Amino acid sequence: MSKSRLTVFSFVRRFLLLLMVVLAVFWGGGIALFSVAPVPFSAVMVERQVSAWLHGNFRYVAHSDWVSMDQISPWMGLAVIAAEDQKFSEHWGFDVASIEKALAHNERNENRIRGASTISQQTAKNLFLWDGRSWVRKGLEAGLTLGIETVWSKKRILTVYLNIAEFGDGVFGVEAAAQRYFHKPASKLTRSEAALLAAVLPNPLRFKVSSPSGYVRSRQAWILRQMYQLGGEPFMQQHQLD
């Protein structure tokens, strides 16, 4: 290998190491800061906003109103747990059984990919990472998930998740969603309304709270049944999530 190539390789290696250190400090600081401070915006919100501007849509505003857990209806927390991650209170960030099932499903159905992300993983991804699928992003997501599971309580993870989750085009967080779709604060959401909001979470840009399809209504009904099976509102108190 020539001297010039060695010099370039050495420069690239040092640059990548420096970048990794900077990102580690940035993400570590973010995890520490947001363990107590409200989250002003997420990586997904920034990505959506920049994308809108690049496409000439200057009226788009990625909007979120931070609220604490005691300002959110217990039904809302229960609904997203029932819909997205029923073992949330038990696992350490990853649901191994669900991952194994998803891998087996994806091997059989290459055109219908199924995910197995927990609420903790989704929080890490939405807060700190870009959208998309890649092994690099999944690796970073795993590290960030371990970080927030180590530093944050389960209640804090759920609080952040509910405040940065996307519920529609430009609608981020449960408070903005409650005001937009039901004209009420998140604290007043009913069991049925909470289940409807949770029903669109797999793809809030495709599934609409304002005009729910038959599939969304079916998923809402399923979520309501799962909420009942989990034990209803007392579930949140029993696991110190309210």
Swiss-Prot record:
Pfam family, one: Transgly
Superkingdom of the source species: Bacteria
Locations listed in the record: Cell inner membrane
Any GO BP: peptidoglycan biosynthetic process
Major enzyme class: transferase
Gene Ontology terms for molecular function: pentosyltransferase activity; peptidoglycan glycosyltransferase activity
UniProt entry keywords in alphabetical sequence: Cell inner membrane, Cell membrane, Cell shape, Cell wall biogenesis/degradation, Glycosyltransferase, Membrane, Peptidoglycan synthesis, Transferase, Transmembrane, Transmembrane helix
Involved pathway(s): Cell wall biogenesis; peptidoglycan biosynthesis
InterPro entries listed in its UniProt record: Glyco_trans_51 (IPR001264), Lysozyme-like_dom_sf (IPR023346), PBP_transglycosylase (IPR036950), Pep_trsgly (IPR011812)
E.C. numbers: 2.4.99.28
Catalytic activity annotation: [GlcNAc-(1->4)-Mur2Ac(oyl-L-Ala-gamma-D-Glu-L-Lys-D-Ala-D-Ala)](n)-di-trans,octa-cis-undecaprenyl diphosphate + beta-D-GlcNAc-(1->4)-Mur2Ac(oyl-L-Ala-gamma-D-Glu-L-Lys-D-Ala-D-Ala)-di-trans,octa-cis-undecaprenyl diphosphate = [GlcNAc-(1->4)-Mur2Ac(oyl-L-Ala-gamma-D-Glu-L-Lys-D-Ala-D-Ala)](n+1)-di-trans,octa-cis-undecaprenyl diphosphate + di-trans,octa-cis-undecaprenyl diphosphate + H(+)
Assigned GO CC terms: peptidoglycan-based cell wall; plasma membrane
Main localization category: membrane
Residues annotated as transmembrane: 15-35
Annotated family: Belongs to the glycosyltransferase 51 family.
HAMAP family the UniProt entry points to: PGT_MtgA
Matching PANTHER family: BIOSYNTHETIC PEPTIDOGLYCAN TRANSGLYCOSYLASE, MONOFUNCTIONAL BIOSYNTHETIC PEPTIDOGLYCAN TRANSGLYCOSYLASE
Role according to the record: Peptidoglycan polymerase that catalyzes glycan chain elongation from lipid-linked precursors.
Protein name stated in the entry: Biosynthetic peptidoglycan transglycosylase
Organism: Shigella sonnei (strain Ss046)
Gene: mtgA
